[in-house]
């Protein structure tokens, strides 16, 4: 028999709150396990999550959690947010909301920069990028549970073993979100998806949320650039190096100087550039950027079929590579000669 003033609805509501409190505790535990937050951040982070979920009270569950599964925990929180009308039930809006939640666990940009360069200067460039790559996954900027759905295999050919990938981690927009994007107010901020102003941006229906996005600030040939990872990971440690100034792609002598300056600082990475041409070139020609990573492609392993000599550059080894498209490989210990 129910006590006076207590209804079945009361028990249902209490059950819902107990479940959401468990999900909040699991997410905070995930932050602690992954090193995103410290023990002294526990109460602060819990309160920030309560605010985001429009909750004014919290009764901490007695159960302790470990090895928290991030995808299922976020799903629990998202389902609650949808039920309470805090967000719409589509992949675009759910992504906007869970990125907001993960942003509450993500260290400040200055903290990430300080940690990165501390590791770089006192240990090595590789230790620094290992830290940053793990952070970019732990914050859910790179969604591991989506990336693992990608299809990858090796195809033996006369040109060597080719890497074939089908990227399935980039979510398809649902019709409702597409319609909403058409009606949404057009904004010039950030100017594009590569701009530094994306760091911490809340996003909107036609622009992804980036509260959990972090960028390493560095100098390339004396100018301000940023280093980030691609959220879609086409290959291992797929990184993007971009000019902090929104300036168009141009392939000229200075572009090659910038590429060499990057590999000087990060010798364990490769770096390359798309063409600065529409359609056949990069997808964002309005913003100067290069792409790199910790990977060896089949073209880099392909043999030279025919050696060639460039007059005046006898200190440069050059040759035509055995490849289905026109490729010339140049190699020298003299960086200036290569440029």
Q: What is the meaning of each model-derived region?
A:
Residues 15-251, 322-324, 339:
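Active-site microenvironments that recognize anionic phosphate/pyrophosphate groups
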Residues 5-18:
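Short, Lys/Arg-enriched N-terminal segments with co-localized hydrophobic residues
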Residues 227, 271, 288-290:
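Hydrophobic faces of well-ordered beta-strands that scaffold small-molecule active sites
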Residues 225-231, 255, 259-263, 309-316:
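Structured alpha-helical segments in the cores of large, soluble enzyme domains
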Residues 250, 270-271, 277-283, 294-339:
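Conserved His + Asp/Glu catalytic blocks
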Residues 212-214, 246-271:
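Helical scaffold of the NTase/Pol beta-like nucleotidyltransferase catalytic core
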Residues 236-243, 280-297:
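Histidine-centered divalent-metal-coordination microenvironment in nucleic-acid enzymes
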